[in-house]
Each structure stands twice: as structure tokens, then as C-alpha cells.
A protein has these predicted regions:
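Bacterial N-terminal signal peptides
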Residues: 1-9
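Scaffold/interface architecture of coatomer-like assemblies
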Residues: 11-305
């Protein structure tokens, strides 16, 4: 998200409050996930541990927040593929989505549930305390073509209107798309510009995934590789295959944990209109840092409170 504001020094530490701004200058907010070589979340870094590059040039961090300040609420859009290619996989998709919902804090976190084939339908509006899927989803028969890319873009736009920093689209799909108007590159640009990471949970049968003896395997299913993996990565999210019940349970906890332990970094934009590539690094540390790949200047929206 972009903020048309100017930072004002505050009396309390940044870790205990959000940034204070006044109109005039455009600021950019980044959600950042950090893991070690084994994939373990790293949640004890400080602002000095990060380097932010815009257009290849270092930027000054104006505001920094970790997951410890304060306990963060999540805003999730769960997106279930109900197109014809999901025949025989809907039970697994429902199970994976239910695991995500059961990992949420009923008092703080909010979620909405969407389904799609060639159109997007909201079956559960955004609300706190959503722990189960609507009963209507149990009787659904997968049918029709698939507009996966379009559905992701529209769900990300719904998330952008929610107040709060920790937002994400979580997609449950086999990865096939045969009817979208948007390309994966266009979708990643939309989601990156509004700072909504996209997580894609690949619902594949064991026969589709020879490495299914590994808990959550690398993406080897062709429909989930390449452009779709790039789509998720460029937004700061990722793709993972869930071919067993244990996979689905573990992956749900991982995704919710990642979002809960994100860092948030705000820096001043260069102000030049157009697309600006971004990179975030951990100084002098052998860590993996995930954040959106860029933003579009001149498309600011109000800061979430």
C-alpha cells in the first residue's frame, strides 16, 4: 500500500504504535517474511538488520514494526476453486481451507470465503470468528472452466479495502486456468501494488505428486510451476503442494504463522510515477527474505489504522 503522508517523530517507540503522518509525501509500506535455511521463521530482527532497495537504490526506513508490537490481527480472503478440473479434489480443498480457519484467533482475525469457476462468488462476507466453511460448500459439484488469475486479482482488490496491515489471499486450487483475461504477470502487478501477498495451496492427488512422502513438497506439478509460482513470489507469498491430510494441516499453520510474524517496514517513495522494483535484504545474515517485488507510484490509498 502507498501512503500520501509525511512522517512526524513520535514520543513513544515505533514498536508500540503505528507511524504518524501528515499530508504531502508518499510513503510505501512493506510486509516482510524472514526465514532461515531450514524454513524456520525469524522474528527477532530490528530495523537495522534490513536493507530496502527501490530501483536498486538504498532507502531509509521511516517506520518499523515486528510481530511483537502489538499482537497483530489477520485479514484473509480464502479462495476455493470449484471449476471442473477440481472434480475429485473438493474434499481436500475444503479440508485445507478449514485448517486455515481453525488456526485463526476468533476474537481478532477476520476472514471471507470466495469460490470461483469463471466468476467470483462471496459465500462468507468478512467477519471475525469464522471457523468453518458454509454448509453449502459441502454439496458443490465442480463444474465449468477456470478463471484462476482473474479470481485472484479480484479477491486481492477486496482485501485492499480492509483496514489493517496483515492481509493475504489464500487460494486452494489445482493450478489450472483456461478462461482468465488477466495474465499471471498482470495479477502479480495488481496484488504487489496494493501489498496483498498471495499464497497458493496446490490441491493435488498423490499420483500427481511423486514426492508426496515429504511433508510439504517443492512445486513439481506443472500447473503450479512457472508463471503461477512467480505470481505468488512476486507478491511476497508462495506456492506449496498439499497432497495429504498432514500436509494440509501443517501448511495451514505455516501460512498463518508467517502472516502473524511479518515485519512491517515503511520508507519514503521517490515520488516518480510508474512501477518501482523493490528488494529487501537482511544485512550480513544467511536468511531468506520475502516481500512484494515492487509498487506503482501515484496509486496511493489511506493508511490502515
Amino acid at each position: 500500500m502507498l501512503l500520501l503522508m509525511t512522517a512526524i517523530p513520535a514520543a513513544r517507540p515505533a514498536a508500540q504504535q503505528g507511524p504518524v503522518f501528515r499530508a504531502g509525501v508518499e510513503f510505501v509500506n512493506l510486509g516482510v517474511t524472514v526465514t532461515d535455511r531450514k524454513g524456520k521463521l525469524i522474528s527477532d530482527l530490528t530495523a537495522d538488520d534490513f536493507e530496502v532497495l527501490e530501483d536498486g537504490r538504498p532507502q531509509t526506513v521511516r517506520f518499523f514494526a515486528s510481530s511483537a508490537s502489538p499482537a497483530p490481527e489477520l485479514h484473509l480472503g480464502l479462495l476455493l476453486d470449484i471449476s471442473g478440473s477440481m472434480e475429485g479434489r473438493m474434499r481436500d480443498a475444503r479440508e485445507a481451507a478449514t485448517h486455515v480457519l481453525s488456526s485463526l484467533d476468533v476474537a481478532r482475525d477476520e476472514a471471507a470465503i470466495f469460490t470461483f469457476d469463471t466468476r467470483l462468488d462471496e459465500v462468507q462476507p468478512f467477519a471475525k470468528g469464522v471457523q468453518t466453511l458454509p454448509d453449502s460448500l459441502s454439496a458443490l459439484t465442480p463444474f465449468g472452466a477456470t478463471s484462476l488469475h482473474d479470481a485472484i486479482a479480484r479477491t486481492a482488490e477486496r482485501l485492499a479495502a480492509r483496514e489493517g496491515l496483515r492481509r493475504a489471499v489464500i487460494v486452494f486450487t489445482d493450478g489450472n486456468d483456461n478462461a482468465s483475461r488477466l495474465t499471471p504477470e498482470e495479477v502479480s502487478g495488481i496484488a504487489s501494488a496494493i501489498d496483498v501477498p498471495v499464497y497458493i495451496v496446490g490441491i493435488v492427488a498423490a499420483i500427481d505428486n511423486p514426492a508426496s512422502d515429504i511433508s510439504v513438497v517443492k512445486v513439481e506439478n506443472s500447473a503450479l510451476a512457472g508463471a503461477l509460482t512467480n505470481l505468488a513470489t512476486w507478491t511476497g507469498g508462495r506456492v506449496a503442494i498439499a497432497s495429504t491430510s498432514a500436509d494440509r494441516s501443517m501448511l495451514a499453520r505455516e501460512i498463518v504463522g508467517e502472516l502473524r510474524h511479518q515485519y512491517f517496514i515503511t520508507f519514503e517513495s521517490s515520488g516518480r510515477p510508474g512501477w518501482h522494483p523493490l528488494a529487501v535484504r537482511a544485512r550480513g545474515k544467511d536468511l531468506t527474505v520475502r516481500a512484494r517485488s515492487g509498487y506503482i507510484a501515484g496509486q496511493s490509498r489511506p493508511s490502515p489504522q
